[in-house]
Amino acid sequence: MRSIMNILSPSILSADFWKLGEDIKAVEGAGVPWLHVDVMDGLFVPSISYGMPVLKAVRPHTDMFLDVHLMIEKPERYVEEFAACGADLVNFHLEATEDVKGCIEKIRATGKKVGITIKPATPAEAVEPYLELVDMVLVMTVEPGFGGQKLIPECLNKVAVIRKMITDRGLATDLEVDGGIHLDNVVQALEKGANVIVAGSAVFKDDIAANAKAFLNRMQ
């Protein structure tokens, strides 16, 4: 079983799209291994973000692991296209599809890693039937759809429950948190059992490289 590593995955939803390439290079140069790509359709969540063209444009210019978070209805319609555009991991919401196992199998068939996500109102137990089938579980710590929200503390309790499920099964599944993560609460998320940290507005502001390095140091 591989060891669990702490990983920072900055969300480009909070980047400056006028200079997206520069912002990505800033976090990459700081030693950040992953990049979180939030895709929103205006149906599953109220906001619309970006989609395959942005992912396809980014892919040739970075070796970072592209962690693609689909906040879209019926994600099984598009997972193969996102994989083809350069996603390393395709992550979808349990609440967005009636065929969770089918969606997992579609992603797995592309050779990409698979993630499943739950919203704040969804209980931790919802992921239990799928733990052996996926590479990562994402627990939303805010309502998905908008950046810059405050973390919902109760959601971290779900992280602890899911980490115990993973450990009890002898798995090495990554456990990601997304929403309202800053330097002052990232250690709390790690202590609850998360090992992949999504941070958006806390990284993509002012001195981006310095912000990223501060997170990496705090997460050691």
Label for each model-derived stretch:
Residues L35-D38, L175-V177, A199:
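Short beta-strand segments at enzyme active-site cores
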Residues A194-A199, K205:
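Acidic, Mg2+-coordinating phosphoryl-transfer loop and its flanking beta/alpha structural elements
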Residues N6, P144-G145:
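A short, mixed-charge helix-start or loop-turn motif at secondary-structure junctions
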Residues E143, K150-E191, N195-V196:
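Active-site/ligand-binding-proximal alpha/beta "capping" segment
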